[in-house]
Amino acid sequence: MNLAKIARKIVEYALEGKDYEIPDEIKEKLNYKAGAFTTIKTLDNQLRGCMGIPYPIYPLWQSLKYSALMAAFEDPRFPPLQKEELDNVKFEVTVLTPPRKLIVNNPLEYLEKIKIGKHGIIIKRGPYSGLLLPQVPIEEGWDAKEFLSYGCLKAGLPMDCWLDPKTEVYVFEGQIFEED
């Protein structure tokens, strides 16, 4: 079952003003709580939308639906996806494990605890938070320090905020589904 293809179908239906009803047999397989993010990229790998549900608060089929619609139509960095763009974009879905807070005595320990290619991160301080998926540092060629710094930036905080003991760092893993 390719979740990226289901995400595309959800968006295709929405562009027609319709609600895609995920078939019951698929819903049954996706009826456990999990976070999910949908990433939409152009064929030349430029980001076109990426949003999702980081925490396991909905059944996966519902997180998938929400994330697909948000990535296509609500990502504030981009205008809503148009029907004419569908042939020129590809969908990717990342299913997230529940985020786990990293406990450290010294923030420099984060550099050892975060595994590039395995972990995604959530940076939190006060009302601010930013999430980066596990595939991002690989795509960007970042090390753990850069990953943390860009996580801070994504949260709207200074790039060195991860060095502040008041900043919380969470890690999660992701299973990635891509279109063929």
UniProtKB/Swiss-Prot annotation:
Residues 1-180 form the AMMECR1 domain. InterPro entries: AMMECR1 (IPR023473), AMMECR1_dom_sf (IPR036071), AMMECR1_domain (IPR002733), AMMECR1_N (IPR027485), AmmeMemoSam_A (IPR027623), Uncharacterised_MJ0810 (IPR023472). Gene3D superfamilies: Hypothetical protein ph0010, domain 1, Hypothetical protein ph0010, domain 2. This is Protein NEQ441. It comes from Nanoarchaeum equitans (strain Kin4-M). The lineage of its organism: Archaea, Nanobdellota, Candidatus Nanoarchaeia, Nanoarchaeales, Nanoarchaeaceae.
